[in-house]
């Protein structure tokens, strides 16, 4: 696959139109807004930076790197182990449901794009979008850092668009936020991908509480 084709595939994977339900979940933000923890755009940026620094950089990216290497080596046992570890790091039922739902949706795309994906790997990909992205990145010969950029941009944009609806703030503020969050992501991503096993784990107790409380929140825009 040529470099141009690979870049276009990355754009497709990062697109908000990818039908995996990324905009259906708020990851606890909806309850945090109702509770008064995130009252304005400045508070939202602080909240999201904390989720990135203490969650995405310490769980998602290190585990994505391990899943990618397992796919490179064809080591499904390792991929299964790290996928189970990822689900264990999702601290609420809501977060685990999101992971599985996004994985199932991505696996349906995978069946269309790569119908020759082995059944055992397809079953694994149904459990987590990260597993599916890792397998597809290896199959399409897209390097790990490039896949991680696509994954991160999609996560940032989904979070900011949730903030637009919930906090709320306008589209211009949203674009400024995306720029700043992307700069932070690009600066810290290499270190997160290289994190040792002992550093894996989240430190976002307020986000876990917000997600748990969102499961029974009376009025909701986002899924639980």
From Swiss-Prot:
Signal peptide: none annotated. It is found in: Cytoplasm. GO terms for cellular component: cytoplasm. Pfam families: UreF. One of its GO terms (molecular function) is nickel cation binding. Its main location: cytoplasm. It comes from the Bacteria. Keywords: Chaperone, Cytoplasm, Nickel insertion. Belongs to the UreF family. PANTHER family: UREASE ACCESSORY PROTEIN F. UreD, UreF and UreG form a complex that acts as a GTP-hydrolysis-dependent molecular chaperone, activating the urease apoprotein by helping to assemble the nickel containing metallocenter of UreC. The UreE protein probably delivers the nickel. Required for maturation of urease via the functional incorporation of the urease nickel metallocenter. This is Urease accessory protein UreF. It comes from Klebsiella pneumoniae (strain 342). The gene is ureF.
